[in-house]
Amino acid sequence: MRRRVFFTAIRKDLMEYIPTRADLFETYPVIDLDFNEEPILWGEVYEPGNMQYPLSDFKRGVWEHRQEGDLDLSGANGRVNGKPNNLFNDKFLFKDKVANTVAAGDLCIPYDEPRRRSDSEILSCSSWPRDYDFKDEKVRYICGMSVPPVMMAQVASRVYDQWLSKIPK
């Protein structure tokens, strides 16, 4: 699970209207941001045969030597090339596990196919609308650098429900 940090603030004159917690030195606002969303398993968004981003010949050669229990390409690279400390960022995606967090330079590889996640799979993992216009940017870059839209909507909803709706108009 990826933890995220959100900085929130409110004017001091509005603190009396919202939930707060105090310690020895100060009083500060509190907000519940536990969402308890259902996890998105890789198998739910996996598109078999989508070869939008195939692996390079080198990495495909390493991928072909993966074994049960490998979590990334480093184990196979150690067996094939004698370099077990390389390719550890090339993580495998397993159908029965939560899809790995999308990073800007997404290097995830489906365990079952020698390729990277496709753009549509990344959109599904990141809860982005399929018709979003990324202009000239790569989908993996924008999704990896952004807070997912569903999460932003939930944060905004919690701020309204727990803080803004309590402040007299």
Model-assigned labels for residue ranges:
Residues M152:
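Acidic-aromatic/histidine active-site loop/patch
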Residues A156-I167:
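Short, hydrophobic alpha-helical segments
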Residues F7, C125, G144:
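Short, conserved catalytic/metal-binding motifs centered on acidic residues
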Residues K135-I142:
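Short, solvent-exposed helix-loop connector elements
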